[in-house]
Amino acid sequence: MAKGAREKIKLESTAGTGHFYTTTKNKKTTPDKMLIMKFDPKARKHVEYKEIKLK
């Protein structure tokens, strides 16, 4: 079976609350690290989430 191009990643809040989302991304089309605005329920506002490697 062929291995897919998508890799699991973890998006961690930059607000320092420890909240994170998990998702996948295509390494070929998006080689850079993701930086995306998402809602942090602990901070109760939209903050930037940075990509870190899923362990």
From Swiss-Prot:
GO MF, one annotated term: structural constituent of ribosome
Disulfide bridge positions per record: none
Q: Does the keyword Ribonucleoprotein apply?
A: yes
| UniProt entry tagged with the keyword Ribosomal protein | yes
Q: One of this protein's GO BP terms?
A: translation
Looking up SUPFAM superfamilies in the UniProt record yields: Zn-binding ribosomal proteins
Family statement drawn from the similarity comment of this UniProt entry: Belongs to the bacterial ribosomal protein bL33 family.
Descriptive protein name:
Large ribosomal subunit protein bL33
Source organism of the structure = Polaromonas sp. (strain JS666 / ATCC BAA-500)
Q: Report the gene name.
A: rpmG
